[in-house]
Each structure stands twice: as C-alpha cells, then as structure tokens.
Amino acid sequence: MALPILLDCDPGHDDAIAIVLALASPELDVKAITSSAGNQTPEKTLRNVLRMLTLLNRTDIPVASGAVKPLMRDLIIADNVHGESGLDGPALPEPTFAPQNCTAVELMAKTLRESAEPVTIVSTGPQTNVALLLNSHPELHSKIARIVIMGGAMGLGNWTPAAEFNIYVDPEAAEIVFQSGIPVVMAGLDVTHKAQIHVEDTERFRAIGNPVSTIVAELLDFFLEYHKDEKWGFVGAPLHDPCTIAWLLKPELFTTVERWVGVETQGKYTQGMTVVDYYYLTGNKPNATVMVDVDRQGFVDLLAERLKFYA
C-alpha cells in the first residue's frame, strides 16, 4: 500500500524536482501540496506548485497557500538562487486549475482527519505552516507518522556561517517542529551538499527525452549556474529537497544517526542554527533521525529511473 504524504514546499528548483520525484513514485500517495514562502514570495511559490502540477498532469491534487510570513519575523527570500519567478530556466505551463479556497493549515488538518492511517509530512521549505498546524491542532498529532524536513546542518550554514536557509527564515517554527514529540527526519546540508548533480547527470536526464525530464534538465541548467561560484567548492549543484523523497523511497541510500536537535532562535552569530547533540552532551533524548551521508550515484540513478515514468 502506498505511503500517504503531505508535501509542504516553496518551489524553488529543488522543490520542483522533489514534486517530480514524488509523483513518479507509486510507493507514495501525495494527498495534498501546500506552499510556503521562502525561495520566493508566497504568491510565486503557490503559482509554481500549480505550474508543476499542470506540467505533470496532476491537477487532481488539492493545493493550498500557506502563511505569508514567518511566525515572528519578516520574510527573507532566496531570489538570488532561484530567479525572479522562483523557477527560472525552463518554459513552464501556466496553471490550468486553482488552489483550494482554504489555508494550508486547513488543508493539512482536513487531510490528516480524513486519512485512515497516519500521514508523513514532507516539508522542504521553512517550517512555518507545519508549526502552525502543530500549534493549532494538537488533537491531530497522532495522525502524523513523521515529519521529514530539508533543513539545518550539523556544522555549517549556507545563508549565514551557522544557519541553513530554511531554518534561518523561521527558526521559531523549526524549534516547534523539533520539540513536538513527533518523529523528525532531518535532511540537512551535511547530506544534501553531497547529493550533487553534475553536468553529465543533467545530460543523462535530458537524454531520457520526455517533456518532464527535459524540464528537469533545464531547471538544473539554471541551478548549476548559481552553484558555479568558487566559494562553494562544488563540482555540481546540491539537490537539497529531493533527498527527503529519496529517503522515503530508498532509505538504504542514506546514512543516518539518532540525535537530539534544537534550534537557536536568539544567537548574535548563530540565529537559525540547528544544534545537533552529536556526542550526547546534553543528556536529552534523541528527537530526530539526522542524515549524514548519501550514496550520490544511487541518488542520481533513482532520479533517472523515476524520470522515465513520464514517457
């Protein structure tokens, strides 16, 4: 039986590819998709979800727009990474359907209520919508199997020296998620920076030759340009968000550790840092499964195999 999932995302090139991977995988049943502000403004990330589902001919999936800003802060966006539209590069179709007439939290709550079994929430943007759901619907916590997030890192940041972008945008929301008591799986920069797509991988995807694999290759063409900056020291582009979906499909591709994680909300230099208690120094019980390594070739092979679904 397919695993029911709720996808909360802020497309964003890597979010878009996570959607492609999830919907090409019969092991997963995507019940709904909600948009969060992050990689671009809330209007643009919502539009990008609708554009991707139009491209994939999955306009049957309910979509709702989430919070327009973080819980306690002004919104920061990553338009320098993802371009003016949030999905610059390919010519994507205009949406052919409308979002639900409700908020992301309302759609999430409805989906959880109606599901016969606990649902896995996959969150690849800031954690604002998920935190609002947890705070407003404590009665539904038991309907959440786990929360798989792309965010954080054990020792480095990509937005500040200490903080990864998704957590930095809304650290208070991320702290609510980590301390919720619900199992959390964290795909942080420690693993996503190893999940790099090289130029030859992009050409492999392009050669698959269907409309979706072509769009994915064009998304990666744009994404690779940003990551050519020498400061990163990358060979290719790190495909952050699809690591969450890949872990659900093939956990054996990833090395993980069970650790306690907290989020710094106050620090002068460390605001938004995920503090991972690697050596069990706090005495706190582990609250997260933290990804630390990935079989890069296996990850690329999984993407290539699933892109053939769209032939």
From Swiss-Prot:
Q: Which InterPro entries match?
A: I/U_nuclsd_hydro_CS, Inosine/uridine_hydrolase_dom, IUNH, Pyrim_hydro_RihA, Ribo_hydro-like
Top-level taxon of the source organism:
Bacteria
EC number(s): the record gives 3.2.-.-
In this protein, the active site sits at 240
A GO BP entry is: pyrimidine nucleobase metabolic process
EC top class, as a word? hydrolase
Which PANTHER family does its entry note? INOSINE-URIDINE PREFERRING NUCLEOSIDE HYDROLASE, URIDINE NUCLEOSIDASE
Q: What does this protein do?
A: Hydrolyzes with equal efficiency cytidine or uridine to ribose and cytosine or uracil, respectively.
Tell me the protein's name. Answer: Pyrimidine-specific ribonucleoside hydrolase RihA
According to its UniProt entry, this protein's organism is Escherichia coli O7:K1 (strain IAI39 / ExPEC)
Highest lineage ranks of the organism? Bacteria, Pseudomonadati, Pseudomonadota, Gammaproteobacteria, Enterobacterales
Q: Which gene encodes it?
A: rihA
